[in-house]
Amino acid sequence: FWKLKPTEELYDLSADPDEVNNLAESSTHQDKLKELRKAQQDWCREIRDLGFLPEGEIHSRSQGTTPREMGLDNNTYPFETIFAAASIATERGEGALPQLKKNLGHGDSAVRYWGAVGILNRGMAATAASRDELVAALEDESTYVRVVAALALGKFAKEADVRRGVETLVELSNWSPQMDVFTSMAALNALDKLDAKAAFRLDAIKSLPRGGGASPHGRYNGYVKNLVGKTLSDLGAAPGKKK
């Protein structure tokens, strides 16, 4: 379920209610694909969909107002710019790599985030070609950019950069009054995806706080504890579990 998905999916729900046969590449379904693609994009534009922001940025950008009001303000949410960056990131063409690297230097953090996501989605070759940009992104002012850059390096880079990525993710997983819950959740999810590559920081992961950090609402607070437990379990180090 959590594996990388196709850029687009199209199903004939009458003939294929279980959505097994993806028709997005079918030559006989291209007109319908284009029709539905336009409908989906038009709807995103009409509602100025906030889902193109990392969850924590929805909260940080809407401080002093509501998410809806923030989303209607092009100064706080330049929708078309961010939407274009997300669209490029979720395509698979290698020809987009120069633009993705350029997006990593953009002034808006969400555009930088999608630049990093696009490189991550393209795997080892794209990560190697973007190594310098990703290492620089480990110091980005946006923690969400840092998480994705660290995951790309941790997953696809050479050993020294894998260690850089893991160290960054452990640091960002440290939920505290200075580290918001959404950053810690994103970093812990990324650590969990690295599996054994994160094992050299097992003791640090064991000591991560499970509560007490910055959070806009208590309903989010249980996730950090669960994610730490899941990561430790996958590393064979959950309480009471034999290695």
Where are these regions (language model features)?
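Long, internal low-complexity/basic segments
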Residues: 1-7, 13-15, 23-132, 136-169, ...
